[in-house]
Structure formats: C-alpha cells, structure tokens
C-alpha cells in the first residue's frame, strides 16, 4: 500500500541520519492520516509529536504571497501580465511582469554583493536594482517572491503580515501560522535558538518577507491544503502559467502533471492533487545536524515520487 511505502522510506531516511525526525500527513478518501517519527530536538531528547511549529522556509511562498496573488488573479482584480514598475516605479524592471515573478521566469541575477552586511532598507533597495542575466530563463529565486511581497504591500497599502493575516489565515482559521521569530518551535540548526528564522534575507526583512520566514503546524497546513482541494479559486491551477517553453509552473507552485508542490530549504514540502483529491504535508528540520542540500533533494524526491505514484 502507498502509505506503508511512504512511511518506510521516511523511517529509512531518519535511520540514515538525513533528518532527525519528521511530521507527515497524507490526505486521501476525504481524510487525513498523520504520523510523527524520530526526534524534533535531539539535543534535548524530544520526540516528534503533534502540534509542533516548524520553520517553513520557502513553503512560505505559497502559504502567503502566492495565495493572495491567486485570489487577485482569480477574481479578475489583477492582470498578472502587468509590469513590476506599475507597482514599484522605483525599480529597474519595466520589462518584467508579475507572471514572470510568480513563475520564476525572469532574467534577474539574484546575487547581491555584501548581502550579509546590509540593513533591511538597504537590502530592499538593492532588490530594485539587480543585475540581469543574458535572457529570461527558469531560475528559482527568493528575489522574485520578495518583490511580489513588496508589490502586495503597495496594492493593499498594508504591511505584508497584516495582508496575509486578513486575506488568508484569519478567514481560513489558520491560527498557528505566523512570521518568525517565534518563542517555541522545532530547532532548525543545533545550537541556534529555536524559533529564529533560518533564511537570512527573510530574517532581516521580518514581516515584510514574501519568500520565507513563516512558521506553521501540520494542523494549519491541513486547513490550507483542504481549501486548495475544494475552493473555486484553485480550480484552474493545474495548468502551465509560465511564459517559458522549457519549464512548466503554476502560479507560485511547481507543476508535475496534476500534482502541485512547493518545497522549503529547512526540510519541508507540501503537495496536492485536485483531480485525485490527494494531498501531503512533510515537515522536518533536515538542517539540524548538517546541510547537504544536493543529497537532500535526492532523498526528498524519493518521498515525493512515492506520494505521486498511482496505487
């Protein structure tokens, strides 16, 4: 059975030290099944259990900004082919559209010199004047969603945390989703204070960061994915929105057939299939002992492939 194979794979990866523990939930036949494996905090000997708050890293992109843009697009309130400069006139991007940002299809070079020495306002300013690569091509980058967050702040004339709270989390009763830092959370790195945002740009920009920095729980993400499986706003998302010929993307989501997914650096991913009415949530702190990103992508994809498999 699919469930058994997935759990066996996760247990093998914990045993191999890929991550110390994981919270996993799978939705099928209109119900969630959950499992909590390994340890959430090896230093203090704490087992993974229900109710834990995780640093979502880039999964924040869909739990926040991506959902608000999808609302605006679906209601006909926003033409996603409008240029960035309509909203951020001080930026150098009259030729880049919101669609390109949402699908990571620009020619922006995300490299910012001396990034770690900049203040929040200097970092924001630097993102308005990035260098360019030769031509637009798929390059997954946090700068796209940081710019999208700034655009939402202009559209709503509010701070991003207020926008996300009022547009998404409050109406959907997601009471445990919030910007970090938070007091109690699963530690992402041994010896670093739990609850601190792992992503450097998001840590600096705080509640204005559209790319990372959110913390959430299995319970809240279940609510979130159920809305994507059932609500009208998400019915047309399993199509390609990218202007590029060689990479299909939905609005904010990665697209693999009927499956949409988003992953996060700290060892997180969520995925859903509206056609099959299936969804999955995987939360871990794979950066706790080591940061072997290339190997993690291989291991993560093994779990995701098992979830996508037809029974």
Q: Locations of the language-model features?
A:
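Short, conserved catalytic-motif segment at the N-terminal edge
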Residues: 3-54, 77
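Short, gly/Ser/Thr-rich active-site loops of penicillin-recognizing serine hydrolases
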Residues: 246, 290-311
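Short, surface-exposed loop or secondary-structure junction motifs
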Residues: 34, 94-263
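Short, well-ordered beta-strand elements
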Residues: 277-290
């Amino acid at each position: 059975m699919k469930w058994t194979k997935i759990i066996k794979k996760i247990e093998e990866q914990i045993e191999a030290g890929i991550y110390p523990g994981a919270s996993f939930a799978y939705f099928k036949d209109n119900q969630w099944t959950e499992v909590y494996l390994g340890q959430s905090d090896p230093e203090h000997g704490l087992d993974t259990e229900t109710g834990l708050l995780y640093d979502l890293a880039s999964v924040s992109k869909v739990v926040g900004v991506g959902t608000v843009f999808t609302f605006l697009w679906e209601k006909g309130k926003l033409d996603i082919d409008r240029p960035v400069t309509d909203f951020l006139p001080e930026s150098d991007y009259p030729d880049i559209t919101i669609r390109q940002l949402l699908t990571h299809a620009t020619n922006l070079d995300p490299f910012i010199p001396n990034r770690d020495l900049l203040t929040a306002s200097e970092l924001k300013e630097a993102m308005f004047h990035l260098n360019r690569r030769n031509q637009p091509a798929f390059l997954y980058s946090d700068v796209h969603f940081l710019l999208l967050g700034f655009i939402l702040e202009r559209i709503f004339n509010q701070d991003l945390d207020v926008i996300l709270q009022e547009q998404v989390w409050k109406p959907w009763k997601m009471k445990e989703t919030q910007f970090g830092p938070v007091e109690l959370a699963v530690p992402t790195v041994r010896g670093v204070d739990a609850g601190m945002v792992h992503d450097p740009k998001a840590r600096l920009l705080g509640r204005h960061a559209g790319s990372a920095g959110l913390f959430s729980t299995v319970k809240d993400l279940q609510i979130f994915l159920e809305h994507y499986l059932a609500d009208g706003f998400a019915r047309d998302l399993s199509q390609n929105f990218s202007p590029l010929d060689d990479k299909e993307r939905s609005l904010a989501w990665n697209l693999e057939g009927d499956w949409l997914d988003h992953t996060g650096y700290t060892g997180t991913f969520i995925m859903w299939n509206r056609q099959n009415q299936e969804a999955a949530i995987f939360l871990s702190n794979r950066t706790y002992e080591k940061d072997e990103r290339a190997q993690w992508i291989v291991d993560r994809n093994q779990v995701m492939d098992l979830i996508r498999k037809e029974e």
